Amino acid sequence: MLHITPAAVDPVKVSLPLFIERCPAGFPSPCADYADAELDLNDYCIKKKSSTFFVRAIGNSMNDIGLHSGDLMVVDKAEEAHHGDIVIAEIDGEFTVKRLLLTPRPGLQAMNPNFPTIYPENLQIFGVVMAFVHKTRGGE
């Protein structure tokens, strides 16, 4: 079952400090101690408020791109889906999140080698996953 939560129509703007200095995930490097700008995640993740929804991921078919069960996806129903996009698709009345393949033939590719690529006869795209949030520390 797909659990959909509409994005706030008029979200409260919460701008937090954005450090332009990148933080390496490899060898340590001194990071700047000051913020260069501000960032509001609503502005960053949501392109069209009226057509954007939050959808909670279930399962592990997309683990190889860092999308795990329980993660929150930001999905835009109005965005046109292109080859390679991560999409929410409907197949036989069931929803799934997969990578959209348009060539050589339309299909839905899991991002986990334990799941096969699906080539449905009737493929309905519900929306394009614009971003997702993965908590690194517990809690809903």
What are these regions (language model features)?
Residues G70-D71, D85:
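Structural motif
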Residues M1-N63, H83, E94-F95, L102-P106, ...:
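Short, positionally conserved secondary-structure boundary motifs
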Residues N112-I118:
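Flexible, small-/acidic-enriched active-site or ligand-binding loops
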